[in-house]
């Protein structure tokens, strides 16, 4: 892809598209679901689907939509109240999406995910199959974080990160992030002299960009959107960031907003999952020689280079690889459980019994944090 117009054309003609809608785009000033706003969005989504686009909607707004009926003037800060608001808002939001798409004879399917669903490969695959089957049955998947059962603070960032992960899970050709901002600026667009950034080819284009916080109803903020866009880019998915007001043009020609180019050295599906979605079940501490071997020479990790094992993990679990300075240098899938590894620490392969001579982490099942660092501006 040599030109910005090429990337925008790819987004405009994507056969499989993820569209994320922000909280503020779905509610009125009182924090209640806005049927007119949802109809406007559904109209634009339907126009794109009429072009044979396979479309997945990531809809924020459950907590925001529950605030009005529960008479909450401010977005709740404690987890229990957030979950209560989400439990009310999810029902109202799903009803409105169903009503609006029914005007076109379409059925919706609600897919509620948590961060732990993405972290476990089997659960991630189940979510992937559910989304795929909904599309095969001509239903519109409406994806949201399952805020009501989250056991930790909601960490997807107004579903921006969730949209990036869904783009990866669904093998999307492009992702559109919609909110109340028309694109990326080098500072708060309300400030004099703020410069619009039309395209982001790499993290170098983000140097000096100051991203603000989320609004009253949302939790994302521009920083979360940029991070999510770069995350999707690492999976090879181009991203368009713009306002919901521009949804028509965004889904038609993509000649609006900020365009994030996909990385040319896209990560494999497995390495992407390991770096950005999987939970770590433990840590392997490496000596300097092992760090050099796995990060610079792309070699497998052998037991002789391990100085310490932390955590209680099973064979094929994902673990962090930690250097002598305490910094995590990568992640990988272990060939042995933690109990067995304690007996292998520091031993040369030739000194081990035959059944224990496999690499502790094979190079094919390892991903380095140098890849992850590319997300940072």
Curated annotation (Swiss-Prot):
It is an enzyme of class 2 (transferase). Pathway: Amino-acid biosynthesis; L-proline biosynthesis; L-glutamate 5-semialdehyde from L-glutamate: step 1/2. PROSITE patterns: GLUTAMATE_5_KINASE, PUA. GO terms for cellular component: cytosol. The keyword Cell division does not apply. One of its GO terms (biological process) is L-proline biosynthetic process. ATP binds at residues 20, 179-180. Gene3D superfamilies: Acetylglutamate kinase-like, PUA domain. Its EC number is 2.7.2.11. Keywords: Amino-acid biosynthesis, ATP-binding, Cytoplasm, Kinase, Nucleotide-binding, Proline biosynthesis, Transferase. The keyword Nucleotide-binding applies. It catalyses: L-glutamate + ATP = L-glutamyl 5-phosphate + ADP. It is found in: Cytoplasm. Catalyzes the transfer of a phosphate group to glutamate to form L-glutamate 5-phosphate. Belongs to the glutamate 5-kinase family. This is Glutamate 5-kinase. It comes from Corynebacterium jeikeium (strain K411).
């Amino acid at each position: 892809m040599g030109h910005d117009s090429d990337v925008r054309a790819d987004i405009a003609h994507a056969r499989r598209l993820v569209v994320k809608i922000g909280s503020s785009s779905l509610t009125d000033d009182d924090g209640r679901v806005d049927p007119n706003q949802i109809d406007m969005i559904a109209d634009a989504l339907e126009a794109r689907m009429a072009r044979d686009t396979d479309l997945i909607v990531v809809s924020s707004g459950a907590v925001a939509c529950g605030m009005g009926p529960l008479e909450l003037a401010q977005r709740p800060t404690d987890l229990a109240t957030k979950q209560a608001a989400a439990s009310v808002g999810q029902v109202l939001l799903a009803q409105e999406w169903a009503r609006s798409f029914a005007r076109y004879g379409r059925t919706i399917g609600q897919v509620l995910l948590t961060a732990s669903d993405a972290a476990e490969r089997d659960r991630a695959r189940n979510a992937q199959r559910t989304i795929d089957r909904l599309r095969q049955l001509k239903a519109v998947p409406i994806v949201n974080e399952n805020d009501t059962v989250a056991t930790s603070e909601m960490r997807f960032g107004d579903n921006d990160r969730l949209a990036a992960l869904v783009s990866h899970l669904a093998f999307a050709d492009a992702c559109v992030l919609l909110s109340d901002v028309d694109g990326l600026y080098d500072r708060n667009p309300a400030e004099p002299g703020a410069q619009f950034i039309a395209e982001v080819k790499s993290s170098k284009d983000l140097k000096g960009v100051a991203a603000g916080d989320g609004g009253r109803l949302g939790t994302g903020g521009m920083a979360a959107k940029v991070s999510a866009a770069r995350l999707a880019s690492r999976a090879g998915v181009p991203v368009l960031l713009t306002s919901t007001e521009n949804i028509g043009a965004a889904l038609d020609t993509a000649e609006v907003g900020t365009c994030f180019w996909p990385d040319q050295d896209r990560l494999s599906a497995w390495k992407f999952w390991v770096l950005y979605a999987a939970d770590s079940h433990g840590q392997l501490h490496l000596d300097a020689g092992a760090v050099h071997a796995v990060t610079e020479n792309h070699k497998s990790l052998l037991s002789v280079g391990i100085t310490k094992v932390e955590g209680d993990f099973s064979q094929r679990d994902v673990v962090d690889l930690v250097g002598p300075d305490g910094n995590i240098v990568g992640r990988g899938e272990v060939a042995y459980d933690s109990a067995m590894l304690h007996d292998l620490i520091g031993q040369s392969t030739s000194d081990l019994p035959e059944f224990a001579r496999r690499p502790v982490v094979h190079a094919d099942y390892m991903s380095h944090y140098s890849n992850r660092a590319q997300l940072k501006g």
